[in-house]
From Swiss-Prot:
Belongs to the NRAMP family. One of its GO terms (cellular component) is plasma membrane. The lineage of its organism: Bacteria, Bacillati, Bacillota, Clostridia, Eubacteriales. It comes from Clostridium acetobutylicum (strain ATCC 824 / DSM 792 / JCM 1419 / IAM 19013 / LMG 5710 / NBRC 13948 / NRRL B-527 / VKM B-1787 / 2291 / W). It is found in: Cell membrane. This is Divalent metal cation transporter MntH. One of its GO terms (biological process) is iron ion transmembrane transport.
Amino acid sequence: MDKLSIREDNYNIKHKTISLNRASSVTRNLKGLLKFLGPAFVVSVAYIDPGNFATNISGGSSFNYNLIWVILWSNLMAIFLQTMSAKLGIATGCSLPEMCAKVFSKRANWIFWIVGELGAMATDLAEFIGGTLGLYLLFRIPMIYAGLLTGVLTFIIVYMEKYGQKMVETIIAALIAVICVAYTIELFLARPAWTQVGMHTLIPSLPNGEAVLIAVGMLGATVMPHVIYLHSELVQHRNTNSSDKEKLHHLKMEKIDILIAMNIAFVVNAAMVIVSAAVFFKHGIKVSTIEEAHRSLQPLLGNLSSGAFGIALLASGLSSSAVGTMAGQTIMKGFVNLSIPINLRRIITMLPALIIIALGINPMRVLVLSQVALSFILPFPIIQMLLIAGRKDLMGILVNKKFTKIVGFIIATMIILLNIILLYLTFTGQT
């Protein structure tokens, strides 16, 4: 009997030890993962910016749940390109602009810098106006004062980088969380038809010609050029740049970071379409402006819904505007090895937006024109990245494999063609 008791005790001790070891291993793995989380959350902000609000709301209010699949495909392409950008940064120990400076001629890099800066400024213009609109809709602050306050708030976010990149990543992740909570509230209040949501997420459909136009707008303007540049820079803060084994581990962790962050962005974008379909389409309201969407939510779903919408728009505008400023710094430093104080850059980039606000120009029109500008610029970082990431002498063990090159070429061609179509439709007045 004593021997049996001893055996049972030994068995229990052994299994408790195994359980403790497993728990300890899970804790270690989680801590290791948390150390690498952050860069993808920063760049994911570009995929839930005020421009996305406009296109997603338009798509849902016009075509019910039919265009949710566009969000899914856009997200898959974005994951692929952001992974390649991060891989380039990890493999080379340099950002994409820095690698361009090494690979291409000085004249070419000056052109790349000008084009990249224009892209960052066009993006920042849209984000800044989105943040301003958020403040205006929430607090009815006059647009010009809301613009000045947006400038101050985004400067504070960017200034926090002084205390380390992790600080900025945490602030932006918190703002993303605010957007997620706001749209969770919206979904709860909207009560969508989930069966239709699931069907239209997986089954592509384009009811008519106008749906094609909106789908092109949603898909063609999804990938933002400035965050392709920025992602390759953000991974440097965790890049030991030593052995191939460490690079492979870093890439593995960053892929997890990208999958988590980009799928959160997918859920938020899908929620925008779903809420718009469940509320506006259901009641026969075709929404064409952000202000109209905010105004229409209140009588249909109440103050909580319109308030959540305003908060989400404000958080989106502030976070994405801050990211645009960071990207501008990366672009200038990388291509031409120049830099200006972050506060001066913030002032320079906010001036065009303040002028537009002061002149009373329609913010929705500005959002459209900024997307057009980005459409011109987008091919540059994609082609640069594909050329560099395909070179074994630069990428080493992380060089793009043949299959990755083919997929990259197909995605790049598709995005560029869609943007050309979007430009044509915009200039011919069909958007």
